[in-house]
Amino acid sequence: MTRIAVYPGSFDPLTFGHLDIAARAARLFDELHILVVHNPGKTPRFSSEERVELIRASLPEAARFGVSFPPSSQSKVVIDTLDGGLLADYCHRVGASVLVKGVRNGVDIDYEVPMARVNRDLAGVETVLIPADPQQGFVSSSLVKQVADLGGSVEKYVPSAVVRALRASAKNQ
């Protein structure tokens, strides 16, 4: 039986913390779907398609920063989008039995536990919470955007493709 998991997030933008959670999850499951989702509570900087491309461009670079994905023979990584509908429906459609969520602190856990219960009720999907690496646990996409918008260096927190995209978006604002 193939063990399929979904790692959902807005990934706006993708950070090394996101890549670390994805790589660790990919070692636990036969197939991992990194799913770019629309969060109605947020106004995205990048379109869903741009975020998918940034993730694709960043995967090869991940190893340079100590994030290693398992060989493709051991785990398949799929990058997809969900711009509408329920996450539970997506899980059912792709045959996923697990959601993967990264948690940085107690606030994240307080947010994720009720969501986990709803996803289990709606689709029978269990949620696995993976603690963030302490070196990346304080980094959020919002913080990265704020620092980049003010001209600060974010190279320690995001892959080079994301750095370039942030610089380009700052010029267009």
What are these regions (language model features)?
Residues 1-173:
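Nucleotidyltransferase catalytic core that binds NTPs
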